């Protein structure tokens, strides 16, 4: 083998340096420090499951921004329809005023109406808070398949209940958007203030240990059959939500089969082959 000349070494170093710069840029995007959406031409159609405090309010806005999709939190959507006195909202209000539960048909039709009329939904949607039962999941699938927009992913953020207790007791929420923060783990830039709007944050009255344990028990009882349903369809994917938000985001990108995620992993490859100090 011919001896390695200085020009060859310099050329190799230059190539590695360029690769490192590119990798740093991509890793910055993965951490949310890069430019705008890198997937303007992509779309996503998914439901995001997880117990209260698992991080849905942190990750859903990032997914929304990346894919230019709409985030449909069904509880907020129902309240908005009632406040706007839409036909579905009036129908739902009658039921709620009588102490009843809004029917699955009304909820699915509200989602359908939102998908048809909300321009943000043109490139996809993140559905949060629905379905809660297998019957709802079946009705949702029927509607989406009829409109040729079947679900691509059913992602479940998984986390130990005891860790959730410590998370939720310090949770802060921006009521208008649903963005969530934590006094210790994910504090806002300014105390009790939403980073994006500057509006005040609140701490929900039901964010206490006793109430939370009841909510978790209900969540697990409701969600297990729904998870089993989506496991059978092949679109269910778990994510370890005990990780820091940046790592959870990388796990989500892997699920979405994002090219940037694959490229970002090449940094560890350079370490392995000895080309990165």
From Swiss-Prot:
GO terms for biological process: ADP biosynthetic process; AMP metabolic process; ATP metabolic process; DNA replication initiation; pre-replicative complex assembly. AMP binds at residues 74, 79, 100-102, 129-132, 136, 204, 215. Belongs to the adenylate kinase family. AK2 subfamily. PANTHER family: NUCLEOTIDE KINASE. InterPro entries: Adenyl_kin_sub, Adenylat/UMP-CMP_kin, Adenylat_kinase_CS, Adenylate_kinase_lid-dom, AK2, P-loop_NTPase. PROSITE patterns: ADENYLATE_KINASE (PS00113). Residues 73-102 are annotated as: NMP. Consists of three domains, a large central CORE domain and two small peripheral domains, NMPbind and LID, which undergo movements during catalysis. The LID domain closes over the site of phosphoryl transfer upon ATP binding. Assembling and dissambling the active center during each catalytic cycle provides an effective means to prevent ATP hydrolysis. CDD domains: ADK (cd01428). One of its GO terms (molecular function) is ATP binding. It catalyses: AMP + ATP = 2 ADP. It is found in: Cytoplasm, Cytosol; Mitochondrion intermembrane space. Its main location: cytoplasm. It is an enzyme of class 2 (transferase). It comes from the Eukaryota. Disulfide bonds: none annotated. GO terms for cellular component: cytoplasm; cytosol; mitochondrial intermembrane space; mitochondrion. Signal peptide: none annotated. Keywords: ATP-binding, Cytoplasm, Kinase, Mitochondrion, Nucleotide-binding, Transferase. This is Adenylate kinase. Its EC number is 2.7.4.3. The gene is ADK1. ATP binds at residues 53-58, 171, 180-181, 243. Residues 170-207 are annotated as: LID. Monomer.
